[in-house]
């Protein structure tokens, strides 16, 4: 199962600003770089302007053929794009220049193909600190490469820790702290969080993260989020029906919250990742089917287990299963699995407006991007919708068809938008 990026969940006080809440190391990068699955603020948003208002042939700058089916989201560092894909049965990291030409590719061992029809062995998105690129694959490979493609180090997590017991293929992406690359394994059986030295790959710490849940509830495809609380670098993790906040120095949790599925419904893995707006964590859970998914508003305050006090609101009529929400101007924007679009107030959970995209048999797996007054939302069949962002109403700006399946999430690359399809990487810029 895919995410994208997905996955991903990174203690914050009520007074903590959104800007200071996110602390991802970007040592050699620029503010316009897209260093991880959900971008600079880890919430699917960008302040870049001059972006295309539609993703049509008129705005298409180039498209590059990819070597194989991968569902990860690309990242960008300076003028280069990095993505993962299978190439002739090998897990591979690709580097692409700003014109759509391949600069280099690095094979990292045998691919383990995906199980879901929309999955792959390259579900997890790469991540960068501006100095190197870190990538993980279903095969168990976790690797760090320099920006020129030189392998810094490579590990086999399956050989070292065993295979993850999951119904679908892993979707959790690695995340970076100041010193470490963090991997979260949230699965049936032995689950854990581990930190590896960014320079050497040496294990810094590893902590168990095991919770008893109904069937499949212990399986997570989300991606952690790295945040800062009062100067303490921490990792917000969602999965196995619990939010936890380990610190990055030794993995010990300073805050936690359970109590999400009191009805003990089975077959509810965690797929969409939470988003953070000031001290509120908005957590999607449950499948978007007749059992109805739930959206939770959790206030991050205090220390220790805050299950009894953290739950502020709950919506049983509006949530998402696979696509992770995005954030703009302290508002939550959701593109749900069946094309429902909703703008919400994270403090109260109240709907500001709601509407629907054109009905289709195809679902949304990609997580939306909000930038330059637009929401970009690809559907799995390759149809991409652009929606004008408004505090008052829904307005569909454009509908375009890429002609191939789209699972990865769109990103901003300079003043362009990149969308990864099943066969190609597409680059769009504002029409002149």
Regions found by a protein language model. Give the residues of each.
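N-terminal secretory signal peptides that target proteins for export/translocation
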Residues: 1-4
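Bacterial N-terminal signal peptides
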Residues: 8-20
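Noncatalytic, solvent-exposed loop/strand surfaces
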Residues: 22-432
